[in-house]
């Protein structure tokens, strides 16, 4: 596993931890007033993440860590094993339960097959967990695509969210082979998604690369849905193709569901720029850094 593979994983985790302080704060004026410019980790401002502290993850990052642990223990992605680990984790979870999580758990509790219990949520967050898989399938694109789609469907069984997982799996794989992020995204779009419903959302983001981030994400929508989150994530990848740290800070400053957007952008930008692009403090001050380092070293 190369430095860039490792950075793809760390970039996604750092994006989530950076988002925690202002996650789901939609009024950017409040962000400015309370924090100024968010360049490091903060305790959460909203009540959604009660009990969390600076350096922790949102519930998205927590799930990505469960995925990394499952994949590391299995030496690959085992769909049923991850489903069971995910269910067990939430049995005692003290953090926020979003609607996708609640619906998936309800389906499991109702007796559905663990791997066929996904909600119908169209939130981008289901695809955003996938960075953990980059460390496992660094040399096998088809397995990365398969695993990314399967882990998404576990909780977000929406066609466009699943297709987004495939899109990002193919894109990040190309970036890890040396292709620049925008070129990789454009080729993936042309080769595999030209007639797909997500194509227009990806293109919107790519075409906005020269525009102000806060204004652009406000226009796309700060919400969790793929309609808002996918073009937002693509904007970040295109605009900050040479500057991961600034991109993730600007993502947080744009408000709303900064975590899902940021995790995917952090993955792709990390894959391109490597570990030196991630501020050292973001690693050192991350609560789960030791555990992540241990898991990655075993792959």
Q: What is each stretch, according to the model?
A:
Residues 1-299:
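Structured, active/binding-site neighborhoods that engage oxygen-rich ligands
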